[in-house]
């Protein structure tokens, strides 16, 4: 049972008497991953939430319970809160500003070519607010943004109010998200911490009121200044990315000196100063956060006359690591790859999502195609996304075993649960050559050797 469902009754029981909280009206601008999860979870705790997006087709779909992203448990929660009248969807931000006290900006901040965050959508939301607000509002940035963005949002709103000849009080705040794709609902409802950056007592009181159910349940809500809150998200993701790249560097060295990275990981993870999380070597990280946020923090440092030397190497190690399985394949077949059939299990950057942004599988597939290989792929959730990104140059298998037909090797790239205990006998009969390159170290090499399967992994 997830942590969220263990605590679900808390929110329902305690909010029955908390009419003040039940009367809270908030708006969430952007119905992407962050916006939709945030809005739906706030509605689940009892607040009245309106989610806004400029994509009319997406909004109409959401009204019907059609979810544009893959996230376990989200569809059921959206449908439940729409039926309860707590969750609404619209294309008009202007139409809801008179009815809400807090507006969350959860729009995209895609990277520019130089690695900096593109703030055009964030600032467009600010312009719309300034051009249409008629009462006090707390404008909260939920998107991952560089330090100083809140000041830019404030300037844009002030400019629009001056253009209208109005003087209306408002506050800005930063409330970065720390959601993991595939576990977002539990992350939101039972958080390690909630970080809130404010610059006025009024804003702090309003955010405290919004997060009251979490405070009552003893979850940590940490208030700080806005620049520190903005920096916290980038620093957190960059630290996690650093741990991954460090362990990949250690794993590669282990192979050269005859050490076993799994034993090394156990040894250092037992040190309470280090801990066991994010110490797993593999074929590189991807997704919508780590690559983008590392680049953005490097760029922020450059803009302020400083060089993030560690993060530059974190990025370099990760880029190299995404090609590590292909290099092992080249070595095994002495670069004789033309015409060989290679199976790929796992396309999303991690399990329990269909997100393929910066996914290691994309790098591997393109390397295989350039080498003249035939590629057969399977992923429980990301097949449609793969078709959109890769097209018809690869074969999209019906299931995990169909991907293995006549394969000269298997790349295990994303550690979905269904890949962890395959039928080894079926694999051997289906593959032309029973060779596995395990990019997540999920298999037991001794067991595979007993099965007559050639096994290569990371770091030993």
Task: Label the model's feature ranges.
Residues 4-5, 10-11, 21:
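Aromatic (phenylalanine/tyrosine) cluster motif
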Residues 21-460:
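Structural/interface elements that position substrates and couple domains in central-metabolism enzymes
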